Amino acid sequence: EMLQDAARQKASDIHMLPALNGFKVSFRIAGHMVDVTHEHFFPASQVENVTNLIKLMDDSRNVDVMRTNMPNEGSFYLHRGSQDIFIRLETLPVGSDGQEKINLRLLPQAGRTQSTKKTLDSIGYIPEDLDAIKSVLYRNATGMFLNSGPTGAGKTTSLHAEIHYVLDSVQEPLNVIEIAEPIEIYEDDFTQVQVRKAANEALNLTAEKILVASLRSDPDIILYNEIRNSTDATVAMQASNTGHRVFSTVHAADCTRTISRLLDFDISKTTLLSELKLIISQRLVATLCPYCSKPHTLTEKERRLLTPREMEQVEGRLREKGSAADIQACPHCNHGYSGRTAIAEYVIFNTEIRDALLHQRSFGEIQEVLSKNNFRSMWEKGIDMAMQGKIELDELIHVVGK
């Protein structure tokens, strides 16, 4: 019942934390933690049994019910009507009496029809960003296309949408190989290989091993889960340099930090910059319900944070979540929010940017290069969205930051 309710409310995560009176249960809805303990109450006497029951749902065979003093990581499926929801299970030992905190991440699967798959148009990119991103994807037959951001920023979903745009553009089958840890979005038309750890280290199926093998499997597109180090970057560059499109992620806060991190790898700057075609950095922000939101008055903290120009932009135009009574009475929204949308910044690598970055390395120098090429940050675009009443300024500050 709890899992079905979380799916109905479009929760991305379920958190179950053992407390004195039982589990404290929270759903993450539109990026915000919502306490649902009263709706899904598990008393202290049931904590151990409920924990074991959830661990037994694991289909991956990685979870040990008896292992309570170490983290567990597994997965299983929830079937809800015609939709399958892939659920990632994580347990973490807490306290000293063998209790475990449970986190369940809900990943709805697109299904088998193309019409239900996530597209670039449905992610929430503003029209001018969408046109620019589509253009660079369409005109480049090889190269590296990267998405950056923290966990939960929608990087994997965006990469899949980018690849589907390429597939729709060429209008012919392409050999797409995905290397994932773990597979989060199942695709009928992709060759999807999951990184596996074995008791015998020699039998570990690492991302690097899969990537090297993939290059011998006649790929058109390679979706590589994450570039973590110089080795990953080198193999990814080799793949793009030999006539492939390579899509991957980098854990970095924004485009400037992504470039800085890549340039710090022990690899050829010239080769790296020649292969890079696109970097997108993004966050997912909660969108206000247009029916029950209300005007927002700037706080003193917010006034100190904004520049005079930003103050002039947003003064009298901001909105915030409605009152508790209004939200409860509203038939249109979910806890005051209508959903989540992406705020993105991007860098398209042209000759001017490549030449400039070849001789620059510091954070400030990279920022200067981008600003000279009409770069607009997530913060700047977020201010526009707040000014239009689509998102709360507080949401922008806490999710994107300035």
Located regions from the model:
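N-terminal "pre-motor" subdomain/linker immediately upstream of P-loop NTPase catalytic cores
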Residues: 1-153, 157-158, 383-402
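Residue-level signature of catalytic and energy-coupling elements of molecular machines
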Residues: 14, 87, 136-137, 181, ...
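Conserved nucleotide-binding/hydrolysis micro-motifs of P-loop NTPases
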Residues: 20-22, 33, 83-84, 92-96, ...
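Cys/His-rich Zn2+-binding cysteine-cluster or related metal-binding knuckle/ribbon modules and their
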Residues: 252-351
